[in-house]
Regions:
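Conserved small/polar residues in nucleotide/adenosyl-binding loops
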Residues: 230-237
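Trp/Phe/Arg-rich N-terminal binding region typifying the photolyase-homology
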Residues: 1-164
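Extracytoplasmic substrate-binding proteins
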Residues: 131-229
Length: 240
């Protein structure tokens, strides 16, 4: 089985939270929004010239300082984020979008504020109350939370266009990324898969941690790759 053309590049993008594409987007004037939980509607964080980065803490060593602030009973992921934040590893963020879901992650986000891990003038941390039932009144509440805590903040602090047109554009781009990943994932169902589980995992991670507009061309190219591999394998089989 042949490795994907951009696999090494994708792996390099996962070595640091502020990877090459994040730096490129910010150099071009884009606003970087960090988040940690799937309860945050990712598409809304990619509205206008904003882009989302799902936070990780690669190359984490000791988390002793974060443990001092949070206690050793909190999960290691939450503490790793706080540790990296204290080290200055999230100075590249323009905002941190949190949700009131996991109490330990709430503690982590609170420490982002209390310890002032980011010194940018316009940096803010916001928390949203996420409903756990899907009924009409909770959906209405969810919409209000997104408007008040995300869209209004982005518009007021950074002048982001939060119109319905801008939202629909962000949703369209998000759906395109999801469609590509779904099609690539379906290739793993073949009798002789042309993509490994590891490769697919890497693709998923880069889609969460890189600006959508910059990673999308690489994902499109990757989608076409396994087709050529399939043709090559079929030719080799018939030759035998």
């Amino acid at each position: 089985m042949k490795d994907l053309k951009h696999l090494i590049y994708f792996e390099s993008l996962l070595e640091n939270a502020d990877n090459e594409l994040v730096k490129q987007a910010q150099a071009e004037g884009d606003i970087c929004l960090g988040y940690t939980c799937y309860h945050v509607p990712e598409a809304l964080l990619n509205i206008g010239n904003c882009f989302s980065v799902r936070l990780r803490a690669p190359k984490t060593g000791s988390i002793d300082i974060a443990t001092y602030y949070m206690s050793n009973y909190t999960c290691e992921f939450a503490r790793a984020l706080v540790e990296r934040g204290i080290e200055g590893g999230y100075q590249f963020l323009d905002a941190m979008i949190g949700v009131d879901a996991c109490s330990m992650m709430n503690r982590a986000m609170e420490h982002f504020e209390v310890l002032k891990v980011n010194t940018k003038e316009k940096f803010f941390v916001t928390h949203m109350d996420i409903p756990f039932k899907v009924v009409d009144y909770t959906l209405d509440a969810y919409e209000i939370q997104m408007q008040k805590h995300v869209l209004d903040n982005l518009h007021e602090k950074f002048g982001i266009d939060t119109s319905d047109k801008a939202i629909r554009k962000a949703v369209k781009e998000h759906n395109e990324v999801c469609k590509i990943l779904t099609e690539i994932g379906d290739m793993r169902k073949a009798e002789n898969p042309v993509i490994t589980g590891y490769e697919y995992h890497v693709l998923n991670l880069v889609s969460f941690t890189c600006p959508k507009r910059l990673i999308l061309p690489y994902l499109k190219e990757t989608l076409k790759e396994p087709v050529s591999y399939t043709h090559l394998r079929a030719h080799e089989t018939s030759a035998h």
